[in-house]
Amino acid sequence: MKFFAVYSASLLLLFSCISHAQDAPFVRFNDGPGEWQGQLQTAIHSYRDSNGRELNLVSAIHIADAEYYSLLNEFFKTQDLVLYELVAEPDQRPGPESNVAGSSPLSLIQNLVARALDVEFQLQQIDYTPANFRHADLSPAELGRIMAEKDESFFTMVLDVAIAQQASAQSRNQQQGEVSISSLLMALSSENQSQALKYLLARELGRAESLLLDPQLEENLTLLGDRNRVAIAALIDALAETDKNAISLFYGAAHMPGLERVVLELGFKASDQSWLTAWAIQ
């Protein structure tokens, strides 16, 4: 179904949850004990190099429960350096309760959806002001210039991802899209309609771990590939600093497969994995 392919791709780009089929996913959904209950979770993957330095790939979902962001804020206090994702000028550092909505269309949409789902928006919960935080992303002007050079828009990226998803699903004889018309109608007729719709959305986002997105397509998408290159450049600079022994790359889950490939090429080896609950639906 082409509609569900476009629908799914839109969600995954919007909430930064595209991943790849792999042994260690960066986002997952666990069903709960009751109807319309479950947990959407993101991973922290830890790696070490031959010098004993620790690198953490901290996956994020940009709208989530307040407790999720509170746990991340506490974790970041333990790090020597946090390289963070944010399309903004390097000197723009949101703090909790700053009422920053984000200047990009994606951020504005995410903020609106957060309100509708009764969850929090990342830029209003994560504290980016500590001295150990360092910007590792494009500026709005840089992002706009690169997308213009590629004649790229959010809509064209959605279509590219949707086509890739549909081809992947067909190659594995799987039905494209988990959200069917019947499940949507059931959610709309539920006594707790809001929770039911949130459950369906969380399940779709968690399904990202089973998607097969071609690495070449990922590299070519400005929202993924070009921004990942900026993050990796910042990481390489940080690794040259002798006092940075615990480093976190804090990026949306969509970016993590590409970042992990380079991290492994740099000589880091996987050492640990933990999960945080972004949405507790109950």
Where are these regions (language model features)?
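Bacterial N-terminal signal peptides that target proteins for export
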Residues: 1-8
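N-terminal signal peptide c-region/cleavage motif recognized by signal peptidases
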Residues: 16-18
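Structured, acidic catalytic/metal-binding patches in enzyme active sites
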Residues: 22-226, 266, 272-281
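A cross-kingdom marker for long, charged
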Residues: 221, 225-282
